[in-house]
């Protein structure tokens, strides 16, 4: 197969993000102000003791650092062949779970040529067993070709396709019951953040997952602020960390302390090779879900290797 020299990333369109952080996080009501204030005070007081107990990687979740690459609806056979070649030659840190999600049409091509070091995910799956559902991909089909993960609740599925929280929760439950791991996406739109509804929106989306899923054992939560995708506004590490802390506390209060401790919460807002190291330093950022930058092999490798920013002295 011929290998194209053109970068797959060059097919992406839309405005590039600027470097300045966007400060728009406000609580939606006094009651939330009080609860979040006490929450953050509590977590600040306990952070030093939590860090002292982790000798290898400073991470709130107990699993490996997790980096997913979502290729979305991009690529041709030749361009994907070049991307896979770049990934196969990349040197990746060993203590990271790495997953990529190619377009469905190219899953077999990627499976046959990508290193076993990197797992392959579906970008979506149907809510039940396959059948007369034109254009959909079933969990059974993903399993049949050896896939172990699926991305559900991505902002483009929510806000472009129109999937609601409850439907996404049912999809997650079915995928988990059939043995797939789920990358469960949550996140607020720009107008929701500016209206002070960031936490409300994330909690509602989390609740839809919690109400439906049988277990959190094979779930990775991806916080994906929609306002940080193609808007020219970038979340600072501190803004991302604040929401991750709140998500973990919600899991503790509404699911269990064990789930809150073990669940990896990754960040998915315009992550690239230039900001991944600083983001990775935040304790509750357990990895990344990467869009455009995952289409460039060397840059994606840089993001995977950002785990080194998280390592602390024993």
Swiss-Prot record:
GO molecular function: triose-phosphate isomerase activity
Pathway stated in the Swiss-Prot or TrEMBL entry: Carbohydrate biosynthesis; Calvin cycle
Transit peptide: 1-59
Keyword Kinase recorded: no
Catalytic activity: D-glyceraldehyde 3-phosphate = dihydroxyacetone phosphate
Pfam families per the UniProt record, alphabetical: TIM
Regions of compositional bias (Polar residues) in chain numbering: 1-22
Protein name: Triosephosphate isomerase, chloroplastic
């Amino acid at each position: 197969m011929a290998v194209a020299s053109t970068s797959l990333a060059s097919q992406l369109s839309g405005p590039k993000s600027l470097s300045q952080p966007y400060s728009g996080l406000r609580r939606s009501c006094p009651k939330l102000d009080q609860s979040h204030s006490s929450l953050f005070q509590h977590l600040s007081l306990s952070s030093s003791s939590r860090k002292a107990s982790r000798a290898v990687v400073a991470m709130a979740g107990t699993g490996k650092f997790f980096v997913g690459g979502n290729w979305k609806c991009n690529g041709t056979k030749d361009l994907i062949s070049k991307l896979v070649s770049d990934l196969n030659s990349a040197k990746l840190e060993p203590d990271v779970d790495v997953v990529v999600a190619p377009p469905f049409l190219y899953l077999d091509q990627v499976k046959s040529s990508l290193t076993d070091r990197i797992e392959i995910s579906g970008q979506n799956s149907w809510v039940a067993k396959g059948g007369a559902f034109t254009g959909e991909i079933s969990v059974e089909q993903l399993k049949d070709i050896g896939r172990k993960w699926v991305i559900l609740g991505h902002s483009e599925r929510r806000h472009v396709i129109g999937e609601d929280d409850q439907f996404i929760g049912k999809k997650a439950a079915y995928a988990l019951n059939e043995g797939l791991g789920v990358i469960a996406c949550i996140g607020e739109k720009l107008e929701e953040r500016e209206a002070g509804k960031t936490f409300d929106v994330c909690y509602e989306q989390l609740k839809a997952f919690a109400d439906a899923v049988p277990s959190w054992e094979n779930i990775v939560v991806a916080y994906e602020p929609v306002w940080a995708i193609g808007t020219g506004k970038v979340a600072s590490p501190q803004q991302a960390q604040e929401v991750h802390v709140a998500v973990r506390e919600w899991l503790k209060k509404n699911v269990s302390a064990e789930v809150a401790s073990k669940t990896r919460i990754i960040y998915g807002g315009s992550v690239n090779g230039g900001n991944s190291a600083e983001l990775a330093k935040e304790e509750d950022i357990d990895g990344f879900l990467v869009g455009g930058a995952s289409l460039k092999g060397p840059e994606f490798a840089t993001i995977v290797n950002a785990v080194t920013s998280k390592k602390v002295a024993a």
